[in-house]
Amino acid sequence: MLLNSTRTLLLTYGRLLFAPGREGRQSRLAKGVSAWTVAAEGEKGGQLSPAPESTSCCGAAEVNEIKERDTKTCRQASSAGHNDLGLQEKEKSSGDESAFSSLGLNEEKRRALTLVLDGAPLFIGGGAGVGKSYMIQSIVTALRAKDLDVVVTASTGIAALNIGGSTFHSTFGVRVTSVGNSETNESCAVSILRYSKSLLAKVDVIVVDEVSLLHARHLEGLDIAARGAPGRIPHLPFGGIQVILCGDFMQLMHSTENCTSQDGGGDAGNKIGYRGDETTENTAGQNRSDVSSTAAVTDQGHIMSAVKNICVGERQRTSSGLIFESPLFLTCLLHLQLCEVKRHGDTAFLNDLNKLRQGVLTRRMMRSALVNPEDPNAIQLYPTRRSVAAFNESKMLELDGEEHLFRSIVESAGLSGPKGHASPNSRGANNVDGCNDVVVLHFLEKMRSSRRWQREVKKFVGQICTRCGISGIATSVVAPPYSSRQPYLKVYVHFCVSKQYDCLYPVAKMKAEWERSYYGTTPESKSARRFFGRVLFEVKHKNSLSTFLRASLKQAYSKVIESDNVLQSKRLKVGCRVILLRNLSNEYVNGSTGTVIGFQPVNKSRHLFPKGIRTQLSRKVYASLSRRPVVSSDSSAGSSENSYGGNGKEQALDVVNYDDVIVPIVRMDADGKDVAIPWLSLPLPDLQDRVFCTARVVTMPLVPAYAFTVHKTQGLTLDHSILLDCKGFFPCNHIIYVAASRVKKFSQLRMINVSPRMVTVHPGALHFSSSLPNVAEAETKWKKWKELQRMVNNGKALSASNPSVLELALYCATWKHHK
């Protein structure tokens, strides 16, 4: 009933759903690359098939059935013939053929590449060792050869380094959020919308590797931001940008427990543009009934609303944070899997890995520590960062070289401006500035530790600021969790004002409004005094607070800093292996490794800083690392625009000649060059909307690299022997498979403290991965989509009996319009 009625609905507006891509992109796709088109996943008329929500391992019968299906699919892929579509037609240029031969791709990957060059948005799946990373590199090379603007990203730093890109979060400006509680979960959902729209406005293709480690909201937030970027097509998925995703959901996936509840609904979803009505499983069924009852409706608005209700109902019933359960991922990408394994030349080892992938640990794999010889230089893999840190520390104790402690410090950069307005320290704004005066309200009868009173006080003070009624003035009201001698609650009010106002003007207006609203004779004023008690109104200059703020921040967040792998103080020795934790330049990024060969002062090693460095510190910050006082008062020397990289702007280092500001010299593995690693200023986590000033931590972005977490190695092929110690393993699907599949031969693998009960498989991921079509099936589906597109563009009528008509809804992205 639902299938037939929805087909009738979609026939009435199918012509409206097809639209050409950007003209600029079309002009550069003259060699057979078509306009943007979206493709569908699913074999049964485009219906969504949400994966089961169980987290236990699959049963033996289901595993055997899926295993047989996988074997059959791969055999079909190896024997299937070409389909005559896209760039596989006779009109394919000789330039493309020469490009294919130069890339050294096998037949399967060449056919996948033709789909990409034909404009298909793709998800490329496949097991470990099939060459997904090399496939991504080949795709990027071919697209850039056609003068397309391609952005290459990955979910982790090491995976990004492996494909020559950057992390997804750093590329699009998405804040990495630790979501351990409901408050942070809400801010995580909001932050997803903060994508770089300037980048989205000009890019042609976005490539994301290791997509399984991203939350579904990252992909959906990218879609919302791209459709709202300047010059984009709002009604097309991703605004018309071709998106290529790559990954394996049978490897490590995003941790759903930390980012979203099992039902997936609630306020967090509404924050990023979902429907405001709270559709439950019952109301989702009601929405389907509504669609059936309105089958004869021809009004476009009602039709679009009906389709949106279907998609939203599915989303709220199946959302768990996993990308393969997102309707956007299921409906707006053409899916395929690569089957030909390239990494592992050991056939017996490959068979063991395939069984491990499906949840079966063979006896040969269990005895790997006994069968294979011990390698003292083997890379250690652990499940937790704590175990990695302990092993790295033990290796450091074995070294006899010079040792140096790089102690992290907290830096209070200044007062934080209200959301959407310039920071007080940001002088780039033309008509907005921050006041030097700050209003401090001391609620002497309310305790600072009470979250309830913090909310009530901030709400009350915010209402008073609103009643001031001054246009062009924005306020920032915060109750920071600073430690101090006074246990009572303090609220800070800071103003960002237009240039036409004096900074004292809003302070005077607020004081007058405070006197009237709090100390007046009205019933509301009397009620406020009874409710909040004694309050002291005080005005302070921001500079007088800097010392207190820095000390309070360090005390309040010392545990956070020392428990953070990046922000904590580092102890390094000459001769120790290290890994870079942040992007410094195009050559040296998060995940780059090397060996410490010495320590030098800043003034003697500036020529060793990376060229074109992305991040830099001001003179003032480098002076704070020294025990000597600041000599120069030239404010221009502290500009954040100064660079270490030889661009002619070295004033920041010219005025810092302190011998006790030390940096490590690292011989990088990538090119063998000696590089001075600079100090970095990184944001203090969990401070958004909770603090009075912008606070950062100045730290050294290096850690010892004798051991890694399994998560860090996903996407890599290791040439060294590895030792996987499973002691202290936490429940994590696919983690044993990811670790074991990093090497090419069984002789390179040793596993200890492992048992069969540690090998678990996510049923939904197994179901999705086993149902992925091979390249031949993807080609057939893409050809069908192109034929449907031509029919609609030519004004031809589509028959309701056509099973592909329902899939026309997959061209429409209006179900996620941001309101």
UniProtKB/Swiss-Prot annotation:
Localization annotation: Mitochondrion matrix, Kinetoplast
This protein's UniProt keywords: ATP-binding, DNA damage, DNA recombination, DNA repair, DNA-binding, Helicase, Hydrolase, Isomerase, Kinetoplast, Mitochondrion, Nucleotide-binding, Transit peptide
CDD domains: DEXSc_Pif1_like, SF1_C_RecD
Chain residues that bind ATP: G126, G127, A128, G129, V130, G131, K132, S133
GO process annotations (BP): chromosome organization; DNA recombination; DNA repair; telomere maintenance
Transit peptide: 1-84
Feature: DNA-binding region: 734-754
GO MF: 5'-3' DNA helicase activity; ATP binding; ATP hydrolysis activity; DNA binding; magnesium ion binding
EC number(s) recorded for this UniProt protein: 5.6.2.3
Keyword DNA-binding: yes
Cofactor: Mg(2+)
Main location: mitochondrion
Highest taxon above the source species: Eukaryota
UniProt-listed InterPro entries: DNA_helicase_pif1-like_DEAD, P-loop_NTPase, PIF1_helicase
Catalytic activity, as annotated: Couples ATP hydrolysis with the unwinding of duplex DNA at the replication fork by translocating in the 5'-3' direction. This creates two antiparallel DNA single strands (ssDNA). The leading ssDNA polymer is the template for DNA polymerase III holoenzyme which synthesizes a continuous strand; ATP + H2O = ADP + phosphate + H(+)
Region called Disordered, residue ranges: 76-101
GO cellular component: cytoplasm; kinetoplast; mitochondrion; nuclear lumen
Subunit structure: Monomer.
Family: Belongs to the helicase family. PIF1 subfamily.
Described function: DNA-dependent ATPase and 5'-3' DNA helicase required for the maintenance of mitochondrial (kinetoplast) genome stability.
Protein name per the record: ATP-dependent DNA helicase PIF4
Taxon lineage: Eukaryota, Discoba, Euglenozoa, Kinetoplastea, Metakinetoplastina
Gene: PIF4
